[in-house]
């Protein structure tokens, strides 16, 4: 069968989210003023709002949520419950999981598993120790960006030291992720398609053979099984 995993963005909202619009209209008197991180009413935002706020990774179009606020958690958990009961989803892929707080992930984990015992939680983690997120009580899996880089660059450079080092570091006898079910990939919606990254298309088959034989959870980005090409550029990522 097919499992449905929803891409969930709980770290931030856009500026057109109803909560942000209410703060724009009501300022200090908004009942939502504590929903975001570092809201201050003694200055202006770069967009001229009569308050300042924290943008995710410095991007002021993405307003960082205060996920440890009880009302924010209730709103998020209510949405998740609706997805489970009405659409029977099987899991969540947490966007920007590496900047969500541990306490939030633990509460989310407990809530989801109270609704569906075989629920699956995985997170987008780019930097840091994957064991901080992929562990009992938090997430079932996280993205393995370290191995991703090692796989394609080793083939392009025809020097397999990098991927050998990563595999041994992660999964060898003393591997730091030996028991962590990491989510392995060759491309996704945030990086260039592997068919455009490799210098020679003959590398694709051995790359996928490696993907499916290393420890962890293998994944194929839609269309990549056909060798679809695509690169990000200064105008966007529509090719991906």
Q: Could you tell me what each predicted segment is?
A:
Residues 1-81, 86, 108-114, 131:
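Substrate-binding/active-site clefts of carbohydrate-active enzymes
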Residues 2-5, 88-91, 116-120, 180, ...:
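Loop/turn elements at helix/coil->beta-strand transitions in domains of secreted/extracellular proteins
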Residues 15, 58-73, 90-99, 148-158, ...:
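The substrate-binding groove and active-site-proximal loops of carbohydrate-active enzymes
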Residues 20, 24-27, 79-81, 85, ...:
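Active-site-proximal helices and loops of the catalytic beta/alpha 8
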Residues 84, 188-190:
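Catalytic grooves of carbohydrate-active enzymes
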Residues 87-88, 185:
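Short loop/turn motifs at secondary-structure junctions
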Residues 204-206:
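Conserved interdomain hinge at the start of the Helicase C-terminal
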Residues 208-229:
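Substrate-binding cleft of secreted/luminal carbohydrate-active enzymes
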């Amino acid at each position: 069968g097919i499992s449905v995993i929803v891409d969930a963005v709980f770290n931030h909202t856009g500026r057109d989210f109803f909560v942000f619009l209410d703060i724009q209209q009501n300022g200090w008197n908004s009942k939502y003023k504590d929903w975001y991180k570092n809201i201050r009413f003694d200055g202006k935002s770069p967009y001229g709002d009569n308050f300042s706020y924290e943008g995710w990774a410095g991007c002021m179009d993405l307003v960082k949520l205060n996920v440890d606020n009880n009302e924010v958690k209730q709103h998020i958990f209510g949405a998740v419950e609706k997805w489970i009961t009405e659409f029977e989803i099987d899991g969540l892929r947490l966007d920007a999981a590496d900047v969500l707080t541990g306490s939030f992930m633990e509460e989310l984990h407990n809530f989801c598993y109270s609704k569906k015992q075989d629920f699956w939680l995985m997170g987008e983690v780019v930097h840091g120790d994957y064991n901080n997120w992929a562990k009992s009580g938090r997430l079932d899996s996280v993205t393995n960006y370290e191995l991703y880089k090692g796989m394609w660059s080793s083939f392009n450079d025809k020097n397999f030291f990098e991927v050998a080092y990563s595999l041994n570091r992660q999964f060898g006898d003393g591997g730091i992720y030996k028991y962590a079910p990491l989510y392995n990939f060759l491309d996704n919606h945030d990086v260039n398609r592997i068919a455009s990254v490799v210098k020679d298309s003959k590398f694709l088959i051995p790359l996928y053979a490696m993907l499916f034989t290393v420890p962890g959870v293998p994944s194929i980005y839609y269309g990549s099984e056909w060798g679809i090409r695509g690169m990000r550029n200064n105008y966007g990522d529509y090719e991906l």
